[in-house]
C-alpha cells in the first residue's frame, strides 16, 4: 500500500506540472514501478507540451519599388524574342515612366500629354517647363519636352533634353530613337546608326528600330563605296 500511495502521489504531482495522469504513467511504463523519474520529467516537459505557442508568421516581403519594376521590365525586354511580348513590356514601361510619385506631377503630365495630343504645343511646352522645375529628376518630363521641342522645329533644344533623359535613364529607347531621328535628319548617318543600334539592344524585337538600323546600315555601306 505504501508503494502504491507513493506512485499515486508522484502521478498527481506530475499531473499538476504537465498534465500527466497516473493512467498515463501506467501506459508509458507498463507498471508504476517501471516509470523512471527521467521519463516522467521528459513527458511533462513544458517545452514539449502541445500548449506551446505557434511559430510566428514570416513578415510579408516589401512591395517592389518603381525602380525595381523598371529593372525587371527592361531585363525581360532585352531577353524577349516575341514581338507581341515586346509590345506588352513596352506598354508597361511607358506606364511606369509616366508615374512621378507625386499627384501634382502626374496631374501636370496628364495635361501636358493631352495638350500634345491635340497639337497645342505652346500649352504643352509651358506645362512641361513647369514640371521640370518641380521635378528635375523625372526622365519622362524631359523626354516629353524633347518631343514638343522637336515638333516645334527646335532640334537643338530637343537634343539637349534628350541628353538629360539619357543621363537620368540610359535605357530610354524612345529618347535614343528620337536622337537617331534628329541625327539622321541632319545627315549624321554614322551617329544616327549608333543611336538606333543602342536602342535596339534595349528593345531587340521593336520592328521600327530594326527597320531604322537596317536602312541606315545599308546607307552607310553605300557611302563608303
Language model features with spans:
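Register position in tetratricopeptide repeats
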Residues: 117, 151, 185-186, 218-222
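Alpha-helical linker/edge segments of TPR/alpha-solenoid repeat scaffolds
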Residues: 82, 98-105, 160, 191-194, ...
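Alpha-helical adaptor scaffolds
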Residues: 102-174
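TPR-repeat structural position
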Residues: 83-86, 121, 155, 189
Amino acid at each position: 500500500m505504501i508503494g502504491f500511495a507513493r506512485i499515486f502521489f508522484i502521478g498527481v504531482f506530475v499531473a499538476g506540472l504537465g498534465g500527466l495522469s497516473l493512467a498515463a504513467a501506467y501506459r508509458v511504463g507498463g507498471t508504476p514501478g517501471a516509470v523512471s523519474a527521467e521519463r516522467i520529467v521528459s513527458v511533462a516537459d513544458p517545452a514539449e507540451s502541445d500548449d506551446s505557442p505557434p511559430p510566428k508568421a514570416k513578415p510579408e516581403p516589401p512591395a517592389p519599388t518603381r525602380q525595381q519594376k523598371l529593372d525587371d521590365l527592361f531585363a525581360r525586354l532585352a531577353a524577349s524574342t516575341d514581338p507581341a511580348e515586346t509590345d506588352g513590356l513596352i506598354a508597361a514601361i511607358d506606364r511606369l515612366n509616366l508615374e512621378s510619385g507625386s499627384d501634382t506631377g502626374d496631374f501636370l503630365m496628364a495635361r501636358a500629354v493631352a495638350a500634345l495630343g491635340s497639337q497645342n504645343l505652346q500649352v504643352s511646352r509651358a506645362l512641361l517647363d513647369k514640371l521640370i522645375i518641380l521635378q528635375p529628376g523625372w526622365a519622362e518630363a524631359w523626354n516629353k519636352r524633347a518631343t514638343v521641342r522637336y515638333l516645334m522645329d527646335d532640334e537643338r533644344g530637343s537634343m539637349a533634353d534628350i541628353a538629360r533623359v539619357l543621363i537620368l535613364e540610359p535605357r530610354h529607347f524612345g529618347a535614343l530613337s528620337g536622337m537617331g531621328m534628329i541625327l539622321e535628319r541632319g545627315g549624321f548617318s554614322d551617329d544616327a546608326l549608333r543611336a538606333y543600334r543602342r536602342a535596339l539592344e534595349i528593345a531587340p524585337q521593336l520592328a521600327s528600330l530594326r527597320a531604322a538600323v537596317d536602312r541606315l546600315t545599308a546607307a552607310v555601306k553605300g557611302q563608303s563605296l
